[in-house]
Amino acid sequence: MSVKVSEYMTKKVVTVSKDNTVKDVIKLLKETGHNSFPVVENGKLIGIVSVHDIVGKDDNEKVENVMTKRKDMVVTTPDANIMDVGRIMFRTGFSKLPVVDEENNLVGIISNMDVIRSQIEKTTPKKLENIIKTYKSLGYNLRVEKEEVDVNKLRPTQNKIHADELVGRMYELKKGLAEPIIAIKTKRGDYYILVDGHHRAVAAYKMGVPKLDAYVIYLDTDKKLGIEKTAEIMNLKSLEDVKIVDSDDENSVKVIKYNKNGVLG
């Protein structure tokens, strides 16, 4: 089943009108950090204005005189396949596209980051499905919730991670591209057993990110799980206990420090 644009597009779009001026657009550029804005009239898309359109233009020039008109624009629809849209963006060089309905009403905007995020997140459900299947086969009653969890309440079950992958996860966190982790919550205490996503969790811990998106499997039990017992044998109580291994030599552990920007220190 294909992923639709509507599942990942931003619905609250910053727009301008044809009567706004270049000065107004410059102000919005500074306030939002965006590099282009759809131009709407009564909810209908009539054009788009970008930073390239206003370079060298008089501050008082009207947007309608510098914008790219609707007939010359590339747009997409909510029910379009997000990967097809990604290919269009790659070929045209656009970093984002307006999303319109059948009557040309602007209903959202989709960016290349949204396309990437859709592909990252789709890998998680299969892992989750396998973990759920395992615990159901062991006779546990469970439910699954997608929520934010406190990074400091995560208990690792893996004693080492790789330095190069950690840097990659730090980058993803900064860009908002990290997929949700998978954790288990029992009735034993106020903590979460980290099952999948150790690089992401340690990256968040090192960067001072307080919460992470997670699929939490709630098990209806107060018994200590096997993976908890294994973690105790490895003396894993918090993310601080996870060793960062130089990927060139998995058998040697270097002390590697990171600042909040993910830079080696």
UniProtKB/Swiss-Prot annotation:
Residues 9-64, 67-126 form the CBS domain. It holds the Pfam family CBS. SUPFAM superfamilies: CBS-domain pair, ParB/Sulfiredoxin. It comes from the Archaea. This is Uncharacterized protein MJ0188. CDD domains: CBS_pair_ParBc_assoc. Keywords: CBS domain, Repeat. PANTHER family: CBS DOMAIN-CONTAINING PROTEIN, CBS DOMAIN-CONTAINING PROTEIN CBSX3, MITOCHONDRIAL.
